[in-house]
């Protein structure tokens, strides 16, 4: 699933081609996504000019002067800019055709993407209203983590992946941040000390910043005729490295299951 860095890089990649452009038409090939697409999306959007492309957690917000298109890429979704006459593929479900001759195309093999139009404040929409702070802003800190974690029995990994606690941190970067902080992923959130929380807040910011920086070289890939950018060419310390040597101590990286997801960690370095 695209996490905060992937969504932020998508935003940075597409925004220069969208802002100030007018929607000429909307082509819907598959309305049955995670939430059914509104049947009148073409009549709603045609003629409107895009004023901004923003991000909230793992969601993209395509803003117009009177309304916002909220997008979530689900498990396998991606957005690409293609020439408007580019033939669609099997999993190309929606095109936003622009007056520049380009179109923003949604591709999603598993169809778990979400696209919702709202006239109201998108940050108050049910999809976003309960989101916690953005991890790369001043609203997020170790003190915040410490306060929110008091009395919580869930594991620290599940805690930092809860969008009500923190917006946008998914499985990959939770594993990496916990490794850098030296915190075992199965530690109860309520057992974290102030020092733990200060260190973890720092490593969450570091991991996300590094991932976004690694994605900088992929920005040009958003204007293509086929293919898509994958996860960043980042050298993960633990994620996906089951049984490989830990970069810190050489012990084998372990894998467990938490909340239906694989968790990667080092038993020696993380306590």
UniProtKB/Swiss-Prot annotation:
The gene behind this protein is: mutM
Q: Where are the zinc fingers (FPG-type)?
A: 237-271
Q: Which PROSITE patterns match?
A: FPG_CAT, ZF_FPG_1, ZF_FPG_2
Q: What does this protein do?
A: Involved in base excision repair of DNA damaged by oxidation or by mutagenic agents. Acts as a DNA glycosylase that recognizes and removes damaged bases. Has a preference for oxidized purines, such as 7,8-dihydro-8-oxoguanine (8-oxoG). Has AP (apurinic/apyrimidinic) lyase activity and introduces nicks in the DNA strand. Cleaves the DNA backbone by beta-delta elimination to generate a single-strand break at the site of the removed base with both 3'- and 5'-phosphates.
GO biological process assignments: base-excision repair
What is the reaction catalyzed?
A: Hydrolysis of DNA containing ring-opened 7-methylguanine residues, releasing 2,6-diamino-4-hydroxy-5-(N-methyl)formamidopyrimidine; 2'-deoxyribonucleotide-(2'-deoxyribose 5'-phosphate)-2'-deoxyribonucleotide-DNA = a 3'-end 2'-deoxyribonucleotide-(2,3-dehydro-2,3-deoxyribose 5'-phosphate)-DNA + a 5'-end 5'-phospho-2'-deoxyribonucleoside-DNA + H(+)
Q: Which cofactor does it need?
A: Zn(2+)
Family that this chain belongs to? Belongs to the FPG family.
Q: What is this protein called?
A: Formamidopyrimidine-DNA glycosylase
Tell me one Pfam family matched here.
Answer: Fapy_DNA_glyco
Q: How does it assemble?
A: Monomer.
> Which HAMAP family does this chain map to?
Fapy_DNA_glycosyl (MF_00103)
Sorted alphabetically, the keyword list is: DNA damage, DNA repair, DNA-binding, Glycosidase, Hydrolase, Lyase, Metal-binding, Multifunctional enzyme, Zinc, Zinc-finger
List its EC numbers.
3.2.2.23, 4.2.99.18
Per UniProt, where does DNA bind? Answer: 91, 110, 152
Note the CDD domains from the entry: EcFpg-like_N
Instruction: Please share the entry's free-text remark on the cofactor.
Output: Binds 1 zinc ion per subunit.
Active site feature = 2 (schiff-base intermediate with dna), 3 (proton donor), 58 (proton donor), 261 (proton donor)
Regions crossing the membrane: none
What molecular functions are annotated in GO for this chain? 8-oxo-7,8-dihydroguanine DNA N-glycosylase activity; class I DNA-(apurinic or apyrimidinic site) endonuclease activity; damaged DNA binding; zinc ion binding
């Amino acid at each position: 699933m695209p996490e905060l860095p992937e969504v932020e890089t998508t935003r940075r990649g597409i925004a220069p081609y969208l802002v100030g452009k007018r929607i000429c038409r909307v082509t819907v090939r598959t309305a049955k996504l995670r939430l059914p697409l509104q049947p009148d999306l073409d009549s709603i959007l045609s003629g409107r000019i895009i004023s901004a492309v923003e991000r909230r957690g793992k969601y993209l917000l395509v803003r117009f002067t009177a309304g916002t298109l909220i997008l979530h890429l689900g498990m396998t979704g991606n957005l690409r800019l293609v020439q408007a006459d580019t033939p669609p593929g099997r999993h190309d479900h929606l095109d936003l055709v622009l007056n520049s001759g380009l179109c923003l195309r949604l591709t999603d093999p598993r169809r778990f993407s979400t696209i919702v139009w709202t006239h109201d404040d998108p940050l108050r929409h049910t999809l976003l209203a309960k989101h916690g702070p953005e991890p790369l802003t001043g609203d997020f800190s170790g003190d915040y983590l410490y306060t929110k974690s008091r009395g919580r029995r869930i594991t620290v990994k599940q805690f930092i992946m809860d969008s009500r606690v923190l917006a946008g941190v998914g499985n990959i970067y939770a594993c990496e941040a916990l490794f850098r902080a030296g915190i075992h992923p199965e530690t109860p959130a309520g057992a974290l000390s102030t020092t733990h929380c200060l260190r973890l807040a720092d490593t969450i910011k570091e991991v996300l910043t590094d991932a976004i920086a690694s994605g900088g070289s992929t920005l040009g890939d958003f204007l293509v005729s086929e293919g898509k950018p994958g996860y960043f060419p980042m050298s993960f310390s633990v994620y996906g490295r089951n049984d490989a040597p830990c970069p810190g101590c050489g012990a084998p990286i372990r894998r467990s299951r938490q909340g239906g997801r694989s968790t990667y960690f080092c038993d020696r370095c993380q306590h």
